[in-house]
């Protein structure tokens, strides 16, 4: 028995996507426009962390701009906008997904350097280096996401004039190309960042438990703990379920797993976890608040210590 003989009923996803994406569009548009305005025009202290957060907000906003087209498609179940916009929308989805993961990881590493190695890292933690890292992140995510759009084109549904987008990759494409792309983006865009986030957060917590460190920096331990907690919760809540499910989905589409119960479970989980992942556009501003508040205080404390 192969997966093609299993039940593939997942039409509930269209209603789910339409509702969730509509909420994400409204909240994400407002939150990220406000964030970009603050980072660009009103923020008095701009450092390397601000650079990462600004790029994260831009990544979110670019994806949010594509949501009205997706919402229309999921409601009407027809893509009238052409192949080019379909490819752009697919590219921006993966660019935002893994760009968000990598920029959040940059923030986590920056926090690790600021707290665990506050003075030795001063030459590394510069706005110039942060810009270089951001360029590298954009190149990496575009290199990983753009190839996926090459295999995405609009197709007619059952010989009608209605066309599809975002779905229906043939299994031959999954077996030859897409499975390799998934392996690349999962290793570079998810597993390595996940390990870095957990490791950096653990090292920061160990450092904060040293009385000498706390008294020297006079940094509120409570604020840092809140920042780490919020960061890890948002990272794990938004990205872990989807990426684990994506691996299972890839195994299903390449017919590595052919059990019908597994196929049914994965087809049910995939739309749900994708909606959770997309919601990161709304949660990222929470990271901005806790990160900018704590890092600003940390930089001030370090500057005072250097001047004394």
From Swiss-Prot:
UniProt GO BP: G protein-coupled receptor signaling pathway
Tissue distribution of the protein: Induced in activated T-cells.
Single GO molecular function: lysophosphatidic acid receptor activity
Record-annotated disulphide pairs: 86-165
Record topological domains on the Cytoplasmic side: 44-52, 110-130, 207-224, 290-308
Membrane topology, record value: Multi-pass membrane protein
Lipidated residue numbers (S-palmitoyl cysteine): 281
Protein name from the UniProt record: Lysophosphatidic acid receptor 6
Lineage summary: Eukaryota, Metazoa, Chordata, Craniata, Vertebrata
Gene assigned in the entry: LPAR6
